[in-house]
């Protein structure tokens, strides 16, 4: 990702509506769908500045990987332990067969060979372990935001399902989320393309709008995995080995 993306993440990940609401949505989703043991060993790959680590720590003992040095330092402070530098798909130095949960939250789209990355993660799971995946949805929503984040792709459900299957994994279901605000996001992307003002700035909006968007997005914690949401800006799923249960 461009340096400015990490800088904005560090500045805004505790206040921006998207980060705050998404953490709550994913926490509820894991509580309902994860089936994790109480002493779960968890690895977040591509943790950025570590804004998801406290949420994941509610489910077990957390370790983390981040390849950007400055972000890794911030994440280590939040985690209270060193954060590894182990790029996908090689994951050098990462123990195989060791984790109950691996979280890759808006990470897989950054990896050129997504199938190899998913296979590498699967090799690090304990029997019955799971991979929590979120990715950006809809190729037609490609924008300057994807460019500065060094995305290789945005996914459809079909392309994500193919990558999952090719990696020898199975999904508990591909669910759209960030759906209630999808019309606004879609209009913004199309308008930006038509006017030539395709802005990559993801700083928080004015406080009133930031609170409003957070409230609307957070409401999806009651819906994701329970009520079909379509379409959405993102897709979430839990993966497990093809021969095991995805629940």
Task: Label each region the model flagged.
Residues 10-11, 131-153, 157-165:
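Short, glycine-/aromatic-enriched active-site segment of Class I SAM-dependent methyltransferases
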Residues 1-97, 101-105, 115-118, 207, ...:
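Conserved N-terminal segment of class I S-adenosyl-L-methionine
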Residues 15, 181-247:
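A C-terminal cap/extension of S-adenosyl-L-methionine-dependent methyltransferases
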Residues 169-179:
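Conserved S-adenosyl-L-methionine
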Residues 105-108, 134:
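Residues lining the SAM
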Residues 115-130:
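A short glycine-rich, Lys/Arg-flanked "PGG" loop and its adjoining helix->strand segment in the class I
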Residues 110, 114:
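Di-metal (Zn2+ and/or Mg2+/Mn2+) metal-binding site signature of metallo-dependent hydrolases
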